Amino acid sequence: VCFGKLMYHPDTRSLPFSYLIAYNDVMYLVPGRNLTTVGLYRDIRKWPKRDKRPAGARKSVVNFDWLSPFTVGEILRGKKILEDLREASGEDVSTYNYHEYVIKNSSLRKGIKYYDIALRIYMGAVLKRHAPVEPTTTVGTGPWTDISGLLLPVSEEQRIIDDIISGEIETTHDLIERFEEINANYSEYRWAWSYRMILDYYGFTSLTEENVERVKSDYITARRAWIAEIKKDAAKEFRLGDVEEEVFRNFNDQLDKEVDFENQKLY
């Protein structure tokens, strides 16, 4: 999200979900701020509902997961960047410099917090969708990318390119079939990536029952913290007069119902 007059085209891919605020000649970066906004929460739920294409006539493959190996990979990098900045400059400085951006001390601390909340939400959500067993494939363990809404491992993107060059993929029909095949395997590819991520994050050697319960507990704590931050943002919008009281109350009621999904198993 950008505010003010930006004098150039910033590249903030390594610090996703951030605010950019131009003030005179200074570009302030607020990392991860958009993770806790009403706007993001609504978008997460709005875009899948707006896809009115008939199930049998969807020419484009669009994956609506807002937290995926693609976005979470960037969040991991963003969190590491912020931690490295803090390590290099110390915790008592008023601002940090990252390329051409200025990050306030409080913004950096909150950015690390918000990114960590997102990571824990992602890990818990994945465990709700897949049994905690060792992956059956190595596809997906590397970096991920996005092709017009199709989320896929970079290795699969490269395989598409190689097969087009070799003639294995000759027509647009062949290409669409490959896209659909990759999308059909998304859950397993995602699990291959997520399994390793969970082990690395927690320092586990395997996903024992005790370890799984710890991840799930952290997921619930993080999700409630996320909802609490969104409530704060909604209250701010209401105080500024941006929304009517009835809309504000209905939105809060919707957020209160989020606890119903905490322990829901989806596999």
What are the residue ranges of the model-derived segments?
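Short, isolated positions within intrinsically disordered regulatory regions of eukaryotic proteins
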Residues: 51, 70, 148, 195-197, ...
